[in-house]
Each structure stands twice: as C-alpha cells, then as structure tokens.
C-alpha cells in the first residue's frame, strides 16, 4: 500500500505504532500532522520507499493500544488530563531541577546545555497556562456538546501547540538532539532520559488533540 500521499496525522491515527517510527526519524506528526509523508520525508532527505515499507510492516501487527476513534470525546478528555496534563505537571519541575544542577556543576565542560534551565522554565510556564485554558474553557465546551462552536478556542490551542513544537526544537538544539556526552554524570543522563520521555509524551498529547479530539469536536460528534 502507498502511504506517501497520506498525512502524518492520518497515519498516526490508523497505524498507532507509526508514532514511534516518526519519532525515530524526527518527523513531526503532531504540530506538522497535516503534511504528507512524502513531503515530510523529502524535507528531511529520507528514503520514502523505506518509510512506506516500515509502515506496511507496522500495519500488519496487532495493536493492543486503545482505539481513540471509537472512544467518546468525554472519555478522551479524561484520558488527556490524567495521562498527559497531570504527567507534564510532575515532569517539568523535576527536569528544571536537574537542568539547573547540570548547568551549575558542569558549566565549563564541553556539551553543557547552557540555557536549558531557562528554556524548560519557559515551557513549564507556557504549558501550565495552556493546560489551564483547556481544562477551564475548551474541554467544558466540548463536554457540554458545544464543540461545533469551539472553533476560536481550538484555533488558539493549535497555535500554542505550534509554539510548543518550536520550543522542543530549541531543547533539541541545546542538548545535541538530547544526546549526553560520553562522560556525562548520572544526573546529566537522567535529565536527558527525562527530556526524551517528556518529548514523547508531549508529541503524543498534541497528536491526540490536534488530529483526533479537535476535529471530532468541530464535527459535532
């Protein structure tokens, strides 16, 4: 089957394990979910035939993941808050604490991510406000059956998702694509492991909202 003309967002929905493949090759399936596989691969000089082959293999594997296309919008919102919002609130303060320690102790060493603490703090502050707006304004609108009237708030949330994607790019730039040096201490390595987990979670979070929750809400499901 040819997947090259399908969008990354569509593929992430229909082939759940595709998200791991997209992360492996740094393909943005959440904020950039509307671009086709071919366009995304061309931009990163990737072998489109290889990607299609990998996706074909993934599509034949049985999935144990929940099919969110079949879930109610209310169930999806409860999942987003408990699985992602609450987790981000726990993740970021600890990442900021570790980043501050790494910068303070290793500031004179090659590869030290100078500025990482400030960037993580910015993400924390922005994401805290973003999630609060979703929980207090947008999600209640959707849960009360007013999703078709939520175009304005949804547009704002999608714009803020784009901003978050750009902030992740800054994080990757500061951390050598979140790869610690060979001589990195335990805290440094734990910090980067935590950042990779946060990036995975945030991309999955944004994908679920941008490519599933928001379109379904606007259709009045």
UniProtKB/Swiss-Prot annotation:
Pfam families xrefs: Hemerythrin, ScdA_N
GO cellular-component term (any): cytoplasm
Entry keyword annotation includes Iron: yes
Gene Ontology terms: biological process: protein repair; response to nitrosative stress; response to oxidative stress
Cell compartment(s), UniProt: Cytoplasm
Keywords for the protein's UniProt record, in alphabetical order: Cytoplasm, Iron, Metal-binding, Stress response
Example GO molecular function: metal ion binding
Primary localization: cytoplasm
CDD domains the UniProt entry points to: Hr-like
Functional note: Di-iron-containing protein involved in the repair of iron-sulfur clusters damaged by oxidative and nitrosative stress conditions.
PANTHER family with a match to the protein in the record: IRON-SULFUR CLUSTER REPAIR PROTEIN YTFE (PTHR36438:SF1)
Record-stated family: Belongs to the RIC family. YtfE subfamily.
Self-association and partners: Homodimer.
Name of protein: Iron-sulfur cluster repair protein YtfE
